[in-house]
């Protein structure tokens, strides 16, 4: 379908400490994609490092489609920044307490107060691409 919009989306690799996720130095490359491949709009792909979400089917080097938003619900897979680190985890909130939950029993849950300085939600996962 030639009327379908095709565009390129940035791929974010390792995020430099202290820099915004979409800072130019964090962008590995841009890849083309067709809008029809995803149900939701998104802003960038985040390249997965590590196996903390493997039981959710998210493996090392996968590209997770991230929509930039701080509006997330319990059970969403989110990109959270804690000081200079970015992590991909399940989100669970109760009052002011937030629990970031890995999908791998080898990793610990992260407990944090939503008012903690240096903590914020950068976005949520809306899809996944496995390159190869």
State where each predicted segment sits.
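Short, positionally conserved secondary-structure boundary motifs
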Residues: 1-59, 86, 93-97, 122, ...
């Amino acid at each position: 379908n030639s009327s379908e919009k095709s565009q390129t989306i940035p791929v974010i690799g390792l995020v430099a400490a202290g820099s915004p996720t979409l800072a130019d130095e964090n962008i590995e490359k841009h890849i083309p994609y067709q809008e029809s491949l995803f149900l939701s709009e998104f802003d960038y792909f985040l390249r997965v490092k590590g196996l903390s979400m493997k039981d959710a089917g998210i493996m090392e080097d996968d590209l997770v489609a991230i929509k930039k938003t701080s509006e997330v619900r319990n059970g969403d897979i989110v990109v959270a920044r804690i000081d200079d680190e970015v992590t991909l985890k399940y989100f669970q909130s109760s009052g002011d307490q937030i629990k970031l939950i890995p999908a791998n029993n080898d990793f610990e849950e992260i407990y944090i107060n939503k008012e903690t300085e240096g903590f914020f939600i950068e976005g949520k996962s809306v899809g996944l691409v496995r390159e190869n």
